[in-house]
């Protein structure tokens, strides 16, 4: 072993195993691209994105940590969301929650 080396287990690693999911259609109605990161509270994303925000409340994208999804102007795509975990408190973003979910 080399100091700092990471030896991953063999096989596939399932992300967010067992987490309940919601799939939503999202459209970028704006004139600029919008990029949403993996742990952003999806209900508070850019107002130019059109989707069921109530269904997205308390949820984030079901994608690997540190990655993002980009919505080009006029583009519609499906995204899968999972519940935010941990203490389930949201602060910042667009300041629509600022506390417990």
UniProtKB/Swiss-Prot annotation:
The molecular function terms of the Gene Ontology recorded here are: urease activity
Q: What GO CC annotations are associated with the protein?
A: urease complex
Which Pfam families does the UniProt entry name for this protein?
Urease_beta (PF00699)
Where is it located? Cytoplasm
| Catalytic activity reported | urea + 2 H2O + H(+) = hydrogencarbonate + 2 NH4(+)
| The protein's Enzyme Commission number | 3.5.1.5
Listed pathway(s): Nitrogen metabolism; urea degradation; CO(2) and NH(3) from urea (urease route): step 1/1
The protein's matches in CDD domains, at most eight in alphabetical order, are given as: Urease_beta
Q: Highest taxon of the source?
A: Bacteria
- What SUPFAM superfamilies does this protein map onto? Urease, beta-subunit (SSF51278)
What are the record keywords, sorted? Cytoplasm, Hydrolase
Query: Entry's HAMAP family?
Result: Urease_beta
Report the PANTHER family cross-referenced here.
UREASE (PTHR33569:SF1)
What protein family does this chain belong to? Belongs to the urease beta subunit family.
State the oligomer form and interacting partners. Heterotrimer of UreA (gamma), UreB (beta) and UreC (alpha) subunits. Three heterotrimers associate to form the active enzyme.
Q: What is this protein called?
A: Urease subunit beta
């Amino acid at each position: 072993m080399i100091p700092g080396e990471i030896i991953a287990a063999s096989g596939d690693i399932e992300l967010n195993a067992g987490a309940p999911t919601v799939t939503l259609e999202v459209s970028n109605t704006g004139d600029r691209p919008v990029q949403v990161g993996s742990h952003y509270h999806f209900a508070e994303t850019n107002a130019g994105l059109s989707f069921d925000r109530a269904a997205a409340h308390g949820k984030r994208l079901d994608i690997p940590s540190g990655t993002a999804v980009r919505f080009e102007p006029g583009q519609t795509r499906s995204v899968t969301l999972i519940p935010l975990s941990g203490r389930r408190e949201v602060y910042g973003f667009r300041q629509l929650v600022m506390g417990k979910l």
